[in-house]
Amino acid sequence: MPDSLPSDSVGLVSPKTIHFDKPLELACGQSLESYDLVVETYGKLNADASNAVLICHALSGHHHAAGYHSLDDRKPGWWDSCIGPGKPIDTNRFFVVSLNNLGGCHGSTGPNSNNPETGKPYGPDFPVVTVADWVASQARLADHLGIQQWAAVVGGSLGGMQALQWSLDYPDRLRHSVVIASTPRLTAQNIAFNEVARQAITSDREFFEGRYYDENLVPKRGLMLARMVGHITYLSDASMGEKFGRELREEAYKFGFDAEFQVESYLRYQGERFSETFDANTYLLMTRALDYFDPAYDFGGDLSKALAPAQCEYLVLSFSTDWRFSPARSEEMVNAMISARKRVSYAEIDAPWGHDAFLIPTPRYTDIFTAYMDRVAREVGA
């Protein structure tokens, strides 16, 4: 952490918890009688509440998207490169809202929250949630904040799915939908990766069928393996080759099965760190929400028909080396938007970092994103 905060940082921020008493009906047929959402906001809401931007997070994301919680923080929020004064989502112009979704493990109601009916953590009794459920809860959050219409709803990866869902479920409540490194539905391969991750977690002997809280345990090894598998899919072959190659940790082979290659050590480190901060039941929920996302499902697989209600303008961005959600998946969305006669701008960004490229401020990505959000700001007089 530097001695002073960067001039383009939103600075020190504090999350707040908002409680909702009205029951939320879920796609699975169950309901949450009450729930909490943890939120951070950056910038100021203008007089007519027209300059608000919603940030939707990806699988392992949360509400802390920008700035610092204390001067001792080593790193800022997960999308600090794009949120702040003079950045693509300029907090001198926009009021930015970022939340931890339902089912999360960073303060919003989820599996590690106490079930009011039992006084114990929900664990596996927490209902399965979908992208549409998240969007419904976010709409209530907008109501609470006095925001009738978002200037833009923005998200990368799973967050992009939420930005797309917003345009279908609440078409008059957003002007722009920004969908980055995302997909209109998972391929069989993506579902398979998620299933391997879930099996890694549920087969951990300390999982206890999701009731590990009662045992004061964490299925750490399962979480580690799940994260290691996921992390491989977030990087490109080229970026892994450039960063690690076949470099050894020491000068010679050890002829054993400990981590000898630098890439092995890196994956173990990432898995270990993740297992210390993330909840296993939340990981299961998030991956299942990914699997279920398919707006075209009720329209015979025709995405252009699913898009019929949309009124907003879209920005869709993909990255050349993203093989988790490849440019072909973004092009599928764009073609459907064009067929549905929607306004859409699209760019494929040449970047070597795979799926994680949406988190890295490369010049062309930043320029396109900034130019688009500048137009959004001018439209609402921000």
From Swiss-Prot:
Residues 51-359 form the AB hydrolase-1 domain. Gene3D superfamilies: 1.10.1740.110, alpha/beta hydrolase. The keyword Cytoplasm applies. It holds the Pfam family Abhydrolase_1. Pathway: Amino-acid biosynthesis; L-methionine biosynthesis via de novo pathway; O-succinyl-L-homoserine from L-homoserine: step 1/1. Its EC number is 2.3.1.46. Disulfide bonds: none annotated. Homodimer. Belongs to the AB hydrolase superfamily. MetX family. Transfers a succinyl group from succinyl-CoA to L-homoserine, forming succinyl-L-homoserine. This is Homoserine O-succinyltransferase. It comes from Marinobacter nauticus (strain ATCC 700491 / DSM 11845 / VT8) (Marinobacter aquaeolei). The lineage of its organism: Bacteria, Pseudomonadati, Pseudomonadota, Gammaproteobacteria, Pseudomonadales. The gene is metXS.
